[in-house]
Amino acid sequence: MIASIRGIIQSIGIDHLIVETGGVGLLIYAPRSTLNAVGQIGSETFLYTLLIVREDALTLYGFSDPAQRNLFEQLIGVSGVGPKIALNLLSSGSPDEIQKSIAGGDIARLARVPGIGKKTAERIVLELRGKIDLRQLSGTTPGNVSTLDRELTDILISLGYSATEAAAAIAALPGDAPPTLEERLRLALRYFGSA
């Protein structure tokens, strides 16, 4: 497996770039966010990569960070989601935003991505929702989680929801949610359709 590439950018296309390393130009498909961040033609770049071996092709995919690559691997593991659809989804936002959409069951947001219809979006949510730990995302690291939200998580878990479901409900709270535990609990239960 080729885990990473360092080399000189030879060209940048709509969905790919060519990186020369060791005298060989490698065609690497990448999400738009990665293509926008790699630099200019002629500059050195570093990409985390994933090599997909098929019967008729060896295809290399590049990412700006390991989180993108890991999410890509999860996405292509979903039935009906190939590399092209996974790249389209990764091009629609940061890995954290996409994972929050999946954990929160935001089918409408996922279905807006080219190549993903409502059924595919539902399948992505169904297959990946339980695999995403929102507490590990950059915007919701334990240091950024308020005491109030920790208490709310504990209450939701005691009511029978999983830690992932509780984190998804808290992530779905509006930014201007009331600062009282009771109101936040009411909003979180409404997220589950229980209130």
UniProtKB/Swiss-Prot annotation:
Has three domains with a flexible linker between the domains II and III and assumes an 'L' shape. Domain III is highly mobile and contacts RuvB. The RuvA-RuvB-RuvC complex processes Holliday junction (HJ) DNA during genetic recombination and DNA repair, while the RuvA-RuvB complex plays an important role in the rescue of blocked DNA replication forks via replication fork reversal (RFR). RuvA specifically binds to HJ cruciform DNA, conferring on it an open structure. The RuvB hexamer acts as an ATP-dependent pump, pulling dsDNA into and through the RuvAB complex. HJ branch migration allows RuvC to scan DNA until it finds its consensus sequence, where it cleaves and resolves the cruciform DNA. InterPro entries: DNA_helicase_Holl-junc_RuvA_I, Hlx-hairpin-Hlx_DNA-bd_motif, NA-bd_OB-fold, RuvA, RuvA_2-like, RuvA_C, RuvA_C_sf. GO terms for cellular component: cytoplasm; Holliday junction helicase complex; Holliday junction resolvase complex. Residues 65-142 are annotated as: Domain II. GO terms for molecular function: ATP binding; four-way junction DNA binding; four-way junction helicase activity. Disulfide bonds: none annotated. Belongs to the RuvA family. It is found in: Cytoplasm. Keywords: Cytoplasm, DNA damage, DNA recombination, DNA repair, DNA-binding. This is Holliday junction branch migration complex subunit RuvA. Residues 143-151 are annotated as: Flexible linker. Residues 1-64 are annotated as: Domain I. Homotetramer. Forms an RuvA(8)-RuvB(12)-Holliday junction (HJ) complex. HJ DNA is sandwiched between 2 RuvA tetramers; dsDNA enters through RuvA and exits via RuvB. An RuvB hexamer assembles on each DNA strand where it exits the tetramer. Each RuvB hexamer is contacted by two RuvA subunits (via domain III) on 2 adjacent RuvB subunits; this complex drives branch migration. In the full resolvosome a probable DNA-RuvA(4)-RuvB(12)-RuvC(2) complex forms which resolves the HJ. GO terms for biological process: DNA recombination; DNA repair; SOS response. Residues 151-195 are annotated as: Domain III. The lineage of its organism: Bacteria, Bacillati, Chloroflexota, Chloroflexia, Chloroflexales.
